């Protein structure tokens, strides 16, 4: 990554300044082709730990390693030049202590080439966020539904559906803001609560299954493209294409051409040179 392309990327400070302004467009990418396709159209590319499910076929995000996340980030950074690339710290890479979290974050920035990291948790992670930001690590926070905590939560459960649940989540949002996070993802959260948090804090909120009032939105790219193993997506996803069908039809056509010996045709082969 050259110094020129680094300067061209959206910076954390410019993203923070978008609070209350034009909506921030975010998507995930784990590979060079997807990163290349979306780079000019989005503000943030999240190299999400959802790669464990989307790319590697796991049932949850938990199995993916930091080494593998860094490899995905390297591919995304090489194929992009405009968007801010944020690397999701995977489960087990940052929770054990402040120095542990810094070591993982340093690898994400130095080896992965990411411009920032994301970690899950509100008040319980505030000290970690403060420790990291004081040492030059830009942090995107993540509250609400926490995919890395599904074992203790008992599954993927939305939050803030009753007024009694609001206060702890508002406290989480305020805590990560005061700790120095430059933005916070609000996932799987009742719409009125997400809208209220967006009004209450001074950093951008990025919604996923939250509210149109958030300062930005994020989805898993393969979900909106209709490209998945199961074909199922969360109810908050709007599907903009059906690549499962498009790819399936293309491969079926290829297979038919091969079986009928229509492929390769003459234009797809190499003739002898004329002497």
Predicted regions, residues:
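Alpha/beta enzyme core
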Residues: 2-235, 241-275
């Amino acid at each position: 990554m050259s110094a020129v392309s680094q300067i061209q990327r959206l910076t954390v400070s410019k993203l923070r300044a978008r609070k209350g302004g034009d909506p921030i467009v975010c998507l995930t990418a784990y590979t060079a082709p997807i990163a290349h396709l979306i780079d000019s159209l989005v503000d943030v590319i999240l190299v999400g730990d959802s790669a464990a499910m989307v790319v590697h076929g796991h049932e949850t995000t938990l199995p993916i390693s930091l080494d593998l996340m860094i490899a995905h980030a390297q591919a995304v950074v090489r194929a992009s030049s405009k968007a801010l690339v944020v690397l999701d710290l995977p489960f087990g890479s940052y929770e054990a202590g402040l120095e542990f979290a810094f070591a993982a974050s340093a690898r994400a920035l130095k080896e992965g080439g990411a411009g920032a990291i994301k970690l899950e948790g509100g008040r319980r992670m505030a000290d970690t966020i403060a420790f990291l930001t004081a040492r030059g690590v830009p942090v995107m926070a993540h509250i609400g539904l926490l995919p890395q905590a599904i074992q203790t939560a008992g599954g993927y459960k939305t939050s803030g559906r009753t007024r009694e649940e609001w206060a702890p989540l508002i406290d989480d949002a305020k805590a990560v803001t005061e700790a120095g996070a430059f933005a916070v993802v609000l996932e799987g959260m009742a719409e009125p609560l997400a809208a209220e948090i967006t009004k209450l804090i001074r950093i951008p909120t990025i919604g996923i299954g939250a509210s149109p009032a958030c300062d930005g939105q994020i989805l898993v790219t393969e979900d909106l493209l209709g490209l998945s193993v199961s074909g199922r997506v969360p109810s908050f996803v709007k599907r903009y294409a059906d690549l499962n069908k498009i790819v399936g039809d293309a491969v079926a056509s290829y297979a038919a051409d091969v079986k009928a010996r229509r492929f390769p045709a003459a234009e797809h082969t190499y003739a002898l040179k004329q002497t």
